[in-house]
Amino acid sequence: MTTSQKHRDFVAEPMGEKPVGSLAGIGDALGKRLEERGFDKAYVVLGQFLVLKKDEDLFREWLKDTCGANAKQSRDCFGCLREWCDAFL
């Protein structure tokens, strides 16, 4: 699987205070929906990812239900967070 530049940029460094839109798969529309639901920073979405025990099906379903992410968007976001965790946790 090839990854986007956005994905590579995200996983290349600590998360810090990056906005939710910095996550691969999360564009302006999904980012706005997530922000409206309290997920304004990438680390808040990471928290949900960890609460769901890094389970791909559960996380992708949550992302779909929370902000309307499609299959590609949820797959990209999951892969981004999984790779970030492998590098930094």
From Swiss-Prot:
InterPro entries: BAF, BAF_prot, BAF_sf. One of its GO terms (biological process) is negative regulation of type I interferon production. Keywords: Acetylation, Chromosome, Cytoplasm, DNA-binding, Nucleus, Phosphoprotein. The modification N-acetylthreonine is found at residue 2. Disulfide bonds: none annotated. Transmembrane segments: none annotated. It comes from the Eukaryota. Non-specific DNA-binding protein that plays key roles in mitotic nuclear reassembly, chromatin organization, DNA damage response, gene expression and intrinsic immunity against foreign DNA. Contains two non-specific double-stranded DNA (dsDNA)-binding sites which promote DNA cross-bridging. Plays a key role in nuclear membrane reformation at the end of mitosis by driving formation of a single nucleus in a spindle-independent manner. Has a helix-hairpin-helix (HhH) structural motif conserved among proteins that bind non-specifically to DNA. PANTHER family: BARRIER TO AUTOINTEGRATION FACTOR 2, BARRIER-TO-AUTOINTEGRATION FACTOR. Ser-4 is the major site of phosphorylation as compared to Thr-2 and Thr-3. Phosphorylation on Thr-2; Thr-3 and Ser-4 disrupts its ability to bind DNA and reduces its ability to bind LEM domain-containing proteins. Non phosphorylated BAF seems to enhance binding between EMD and LMNA. Dephosphorylated by protein phosphatase 2A (PP2A) following interaction with ANKLE2/LEM4 during mitotic exit, leading to mitotic nuclear envelope reassembly. GO terms for molecular function: DNA binding; double-stranded DNA binding; identical protein binding; protein homodimerization activity. It comes from Rattus norvegicus (Rat). The modification Phosphoserine is found at residue 4. The modification Phosphothreonine is found at residues 2-3. One of its GO terms (cellular component) is chromatin. This is Barrier-to-autointegration factor. Its main location: nucleus. Homodimer. Heterodimerizes with BANF2. Interacts with ANKLE2/LEM4, leading to decreased phosphorylation by VRK1 and promoting dephosphorylation by protein phosphatase 2A (PP2A). Binds non-specifically to double-stranded DNA, and is found as a hexamer or dodecamer upon DNA binding. Binds to LEM domain-containing nuclear proteins such as LEMD3/MAN1, TMPO/LAP2 and EMD (emerin). Interacts with ANKLE1 (via LEM domain); the interaction may favor BANF1 dimerization. Interacts with CRX and LMNA (lamin-A). Binds linker histone H1.1 and core histones H3. Interacts with LEMD2 (via LEM domain). Residues 20-35 form the HhH domain.
